[in-house]
Structures are given as C-alpha cells and as structure tokens.
Amino acid sequence: MNLPIFLALPLVYAIIVPKNHASTLVHRHPLHHRSSPSSWTSYGCWIDNTGARTLSAASYANTTGMTVESCISFCSSGSNSYVYAGVEYAQECYCGNFLASGASNVSMSECDMTCTGNASEFCGAGDRLNVYWNGTQPPSSPIIVRSAGNWTSLGCYNDSTTTRALANGMGVTGEVTVESCTTACQDAGYQYAGVEYADECSDCGMTLDNGSEPTPASSCDMTCAGNSSEYCGGPDHLNLYNYTGTLTTTGNAGSGTGTELLLTASLSGGWTYGGCYVDNANGRVLGDELDSDNMTVESCVAHCTADNFTIAGLEYSTQCFCGNELIDGAVKAPDSDCDMACGGNATEACGAGNRLSVYTSMGNITIIPVPTPLTSGLPGQWVYQGCLAEPAPGSHLLPYENDWTNNNTVEACLNQCAAFGYPAAGLEYGEQCFCGDISDVVDNNGTFVSDSECNMPCSGDPVHLCGANNLMSAYYWNGTMNAWHTPKNIGRYEFLIGGVVVPLIATVGINNKVTFLEKYPTSEFANSTGAYELDISLVDNYLLAWREMHVKSDVFCSGSIILPDKGARQINVGGWSLESTYGIRLYTPDGQPGVNGTNDWEENANELSLQRGRWYPTAMMMPNGSILVVGGETGSNGPPQPSLEILPKPPGGDTVITLDYLQRTDPNNLYPFLIVLPSGRFFIGYYNEARILDPVTFDTVTVLPNMPGAVNNFLAGRTYPMEGTAVLLPQHAPYTDPIEILICGGSTPGAAIALDNCISIIPEASNPTWTLERMPSKRVMPCMVTLPDGTYMILNGAHQGVAGFGLASDPNFSALLYDPSQPVGQRISILNSTIVARLYHSEATLLPDGRVLVSGSDPETNYPNGTAVYPEEFRIEVYIPPYLNQGFRQPEFTIAKTDWTLGGQYDIVVTLYQGTISTMRVSLIAASSSTHGNVMSGGRIIFPEFTCSGNTCTITAPPNAFVCPPGWHQLFVLDGPTPSHSAWVRIGGDPAQLGNWPDYPDFTTPGI
C-alpha cells in the first residue's frame, strides 16, 4: 500500500500561548474592542464584499501596521470626518457615514482575523468588517443629485470594466463629486457624464455605448468621495447625467487638460517607464492599492519603493498599485490609452479607465499568465476535484486552517495535509490552506460549483488558482492514507471494583497489589488518608480488598518510580506546595495476594528531602543506580524549577544543575519524558522539543528536531499541560537495532484542540527525524500501557482541552492498540469503548495477569450551577486485551532464581496449552508507575534471547545497564499471542546501594 511521505513544511502563524497549570488557565485571546479612542464603540461584525462595500467612503490598507485605533484615527481626522470606521481582513480600513443598504450584522465570532499591527485585536475577516461608531448621528441620507447646472440626472445605468458605457475617462482635480465630474466633462465638450464607484469620474462621452441600460437606483449606492451626501454610482454602475445646454467644444480629449501629458522617463532609484498596460481584462494585474487625490508618478513610485516592490502602476488619475510582476495575463496597450492626468500633477499621465501607467526599477517586467487550477504533476496520490462552495460565510467544510499570506501554493498545502494524515485539502482566498477528511465534505454538505468561480491566484504561486472567497480548490488523496484496523476481536472493558479514592498515581508492587495515591487532603471524603492498596485477588469482597495506608504530606502531582533494592521500594518525590514539594516518600511492598501487608509509607521532611521543591517533576532510574529528578515548578502554579538533581544526595554536596531550556519553555514542559538510551545517554522530551544528554555532565549532546504538532499549529505541545504520553518501543536481542521512542497525543495552545497523531523517532540515528502517524481521533491526557506481546494500548483522555482542573471536555471513550511490528501508517487498531469518562488524573497500569487496570479521573468540571459535568471517578475498570479475549488458556511457568545479573542465564520451566516452543516468546517489562499519562520507566519492554530443551528454557539477561537499567521487571511467557501471569525478577542488582538508604532510624531499609 502507498503511504504518505513525511516532509518538512512551511511554518504557519504563531499563536499566543496561554500560561496554564493544573488549576488555572489564563486565555490570552485577541479582543473585539468594546470601547476605543474617545467616544468610539464597537458596532458589531458586518458582512462586506468587494462588489458592494458596507462602508464606501474613504479607505486605506496597511499590511504590517493596521490597528483599530489607527483606522479610527484615519476615519475621524483631517478631511475625513465620518461616524463609522471598519477594519477588515486584518489590514484594511473603511470609513463612511452610512452602512450600505442590505448590509447585515453577524456573530462577532465571524470577525476572527487579528490586526497586522496588533495581534491582540481583531480586524474583521474575509468579507467581514468590525465596525465602530463615534456615537453621533450620521448626516442626512445621501441623495441622487437631480440636476447640476445644465446637467440632468438620467438615473442609474449598468457599466463594465471591459465594455464601457461612456468611452472617455476623465481626470478630476480633488475628490470626485457629481458637480466636479459634470464640470470636467462639460469643459472637455462631452454630452454625457457618469460617476462610478464613489471616486471615479469614470466616463464622459457623446453617445451611450455597449448596450448600457437603466438599472434600479439601489444599484448606485456608493456615496461620492468628495461629498458623502451625494451618490456616485456603485460597482459596475454609474449615475448618468445629460447636458441640456449648448456645448461650446466637441468632446475629444481624454484627459480634459488641453495639454499633452508627459511620460516620466527618468526617476530616482533606477525607476523607468515600462509602458501602458490593460487592467481588469482578467482581473487586477497589480495589488497593494493606494488612493490619493494628490497622486503623482513620483509619490506612487516612492510608496512602492518603501514597501520593497519593483513595479508601480498608476490608474484613474488617483490610484497607485504595487507589485513585483504583472499578473492575470496583462497585455500592453498604446501609450495614448493612458491619457488621464495625475490628480497631483496635471502634466503627468496616471493611466486611465482600466489602463495602468507602469514603472519598473528592474528594467524588465515579468508577466504572469492568467492562473489556472493545478491538475497535473501533483505530489503523492493527490487528485484535483474541482471548486467547492463553503456551506455558509464564516463556516468551513474542512476543520484545520493554515493562513499563508505570502507563500501559499497547491503543492505546499497538499504536502502539509498529507504529512499529518489528512486525505482532503482545500485552498481558499488565495492564501488559505484547509485540511481534513473527505467525510468532512460530505457531512457538511459540500457542493461543487463551476471551476471558473475559484478564480483567486495562490499567494505563493500566481500562475495557479487557490479558490476564492468562500470557495475552495479541492483535492483528494486517491487511496488509503490511514489504514486503521477494525479487528473482530477488540477486547472489552469490565467493571472491577468501586474505589475508596480518586487516584492520581497507580503503581503495581512486587506483591502483585496496586498502590494508589490521591491529592491528599483534598479527597471527596473527610477521613481519607490519601493512600490505599488494592488486593486484586479480593475484589469480590469490597471490605477486604482495600488496605488503608498513610502519607504525611500532599503528593498532588508528584512523581514515582520503583527502586532496584531488594524490597522493590516505591519512591515518590515532590508534591503540591510548601514542604510537600520537597517530599521524599518510600514504601516497601509486603504481604501477598489474599494476605494483608503491614508496611506503610515512610516520610520525614526533617531528615530526607529534595534539594529543590518540585511540583510536576519526573524521576528516572539511571544506569549507575542513582535517581535522576528533573523539572517541575516551585509549587502549585508557581515559578519554574528548571533544574535536575540526583538522589541520594552526596554528603555536603549540591547536585542541582539548571537547565536553560526548561526555563525557556515553562510552563509547557512539566512531567518531561526521560528515557535511558542504549548508548547510556539520556533522552529528554519537553513541550515540543527534545534532546540527548550526556549521562555524566548532563550537557546537551544532540538537539533533536522539534516535535511535529498540529497540521495548523506547530506550537502544539506533548508534555503537561498539553499532555501526551510517551513509551520506548521494544528492544530485541541481540540489541543491535536502534531504539525508537513513541509519543502519542497532546494539544494546542489557545483553542486547545487535542492532537490526533502519534510521532516516533530514532533519537540516536545519524539524521534523526520524526515520523507522524495519525490516530482515528483526537486525544489529550491519554495513557499508554506496554503489553507483554510488545504492543501498546492507548486509552483515556479528551478530544479537547489541556490538563488541569476544568480545562478539558468531550471525553474520548475509545481504546486503541498500537503494534510497532506493522508498517508505519498501518499500526493502529480500534478497540472497544467504555462508558466512563477518564480525564485529568486518570491512569492505566498493566496487571500481572495481563489485564490493564484503568482508574481515576478528577476533572472538577462543573456547570454554572455548581453540579459536576464529569464526576470524581471512583469506579475502577480493567480492560481485557484481545490476547485474553480469545478464551485461550494462559501458559504457565516456574522460576527458581529471580535476582539476575546482567548477561546471566536463568532457567524457567514452561507449560504451553496452544502452541509449541518454536512459537513461544519471552518478554520483560520494567516496573513502572502511572500518573498524568507519564510512565516513568518509559514503558520499557525487552525480548531477551532464550533457548529451550524440552520444556526447560534458558533466558539470557540483557547485557548491560544501558539496554536495561537496574530494576524490577515482570517476566512473561507468550504462547503465541497469549501471555502467562508474570513473575517478578530483579535485573542488574542495586549498584548505588539504595537498599541501605536513607540511614535514619525511622526509615526501613531492605538491603541491597
């Protein structure tokens, strides 16, 4: 099967990143101003379009500095004194005293583009205008001037940019009014005069040409630029006047000046005249318009030079356009066609109606042909579909939008969508690239229209078309882009037992019981101790299944691992606030299934503590047997703690090392991912970055490429609070293959749209790159569990939000299975679903019998009346993976020696019930603790070498502490796909002699 190629792609707009933590999220969104300079206030979001402006008086554009304030200033100062100001498309400003008839108000959410000069303000959108009002009543409604001297109104007539009703454009000194235009036509000796598009004395003539006919007066709805109480035509419509007096001259002079116009042959900066060109035959041949009643060749060239353009064009006496090439198949016209005098210098030619006087600083002028849809030579398996109409203004068929103002191309858009696993792509408004699924088009009632309606060139490729306003050039992937399997055997969820605690940390001990820690003392129950142990063998007897334990300080958002000492102690570090952030807590599992233990958590902050207070730290067992603790903050929503430290702390020494990259990326790097690599170096993943560290100095050895995020937001993150989950993919004897790391889920800043992809990397490859695989659904706060057969279950989490209280919604009830033995793009199977929402503070843990324990959910999301949207979840479930759902009897084995040295050989005696020794496998899964989606062993699984004679098999332990850091492992035997119950083995001993630490009388040390 053909699979998508993963490419490096253009970056998209940066998005304001909110600072968010477990209990708060401060959203920093752009603002719709409710109050503005002086008495101006917001008047709402209004529909606008290029054919009939809602505000049709003065206007200007600023591609880099537009703000609400600057637009209001423009509309209320100098010769402008308007009661309405409007900002549109991030960079355009419009003024007027009237809202055009038929203009309609829409939801403020549709005005969603930020201003080019202030990203904290909204400046409308495509065909959407943020309107502001100064509080004063507008002047009287404009009128159609019935007569001006001997000129009499004939009404509103249709016109066209290609077939003019009147043949001769006319230059007018100053801003256009009915009186100034009729005077100019009379002075030039013409019978008819027409005013159009507010500021154009566009036509004078002796006859009415090209079949121009009367139209309704409402079509001439634009007020004159020089007098807002008069109407001066509209788009492609003119107010026509007839001279009833006696003409003293016969009309024949296009400029009306009576003098020959000069072509400026030499300008500063190497600018030269390039000729007269036809405009609007197929569309505007230049963009970046500037209008000025005092326009000159020199001022237009200066404007274009300041904006780094190489071509300047002047039209209609007062219009200046800039660009670097002429587009839409521009063709030359006779120089005599450019016969209108400049508004600011009557001796210079400034084009004419649909004629541009063109100047260039490069000598040559590049002509870009009329753009067409790109239908051949497409990347991958993309196929052009046609022009798709959006369902309604402001809504979109495809969900993910990129805005590439200057560099949108069909190829870039298709590659971006394919790289993130989306088989439908659409290009719109020249600069927008949308990605999604073909089903999105169907579900949103997408309708194909004529290809001719998608007529806007791509911002980065003017030769090809990229849709139009509310129209997209659509492309589909021809083939299967994401092969998500739907097997018949999908396993199932089962209710296990009601809980006494809403856990935030779950750990399976070597006594085969599960310890739970909660955010003490914030339990649902006043008498909760914050710590309990569950005996899985007694779940049918609720009163016997739970054992009460105790912690002395608040473990909320701490980190846990299993020590390699003889007792397999569980160590928990960090906490919620104050003294608890320094906490070090130890528990030695005891008892056995069906028999209560007596040990409890041990803690004494006066004797044993971290060197720095930490909330949301990660802990990792190093190859030398010491404990690495990294990151966090100084307390709940406190300043960053961007450092690492080593436990046990040597006498008199401080092991803290500051990490500048954690300082820089706070608060989006909490619970960083830590994994020991086969080289002995350490992988650290935080926010959307990753690097490899030296195991002795902790200096950076390699900065890895940034992690891919969302298709439309490269600022998406993978660690808390934009929380994903990470594991190490399987290692197989003889351990020569490079190791691979898998990270799934996460979220985006701002809107907090969860990610629907997994990414993987071989960090120690010669040229490491991330490979992206799309998941069937979005997921933030997921959990990932390593299974004995080398597959991984992905479950829990939400479709939207980030980690923290009340910050996520729309639970993801479905479970997935990731199988790294399959080809990339074909590794995910869709499993069963639950009815229990598992959001913030949920866990998933492998049990010794091969089932997955699913617990927790502490979202604290409430309705306005205070009732919970999602409950504090006490119910504990198990998931029966497909390998146990077949009904096969699990294999069995016995083992004599469970304390293994690296590279040693150890015997087991196996009993298989389905297969034979030839199909048997053996796996070792490192002991771990689950919290916030972080498996602090990295979910390490090893398939060691073994040989068998009869039913006695000899396993060779992993060769070194880089492949297998010291610690306890669950040993499984697999009969085909079916795992046995596990046995605990310790591999690599206790090289740092943690079993003798800490040496205080109130701590129990199990020995090494």
Label for each model-derived stretch:
Residues 15-483:
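Peripheral, non-catalytic regulatory segments
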Residues 371, 483-494, 509-551, 575-594, 665-802:
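Beta-propeller domains
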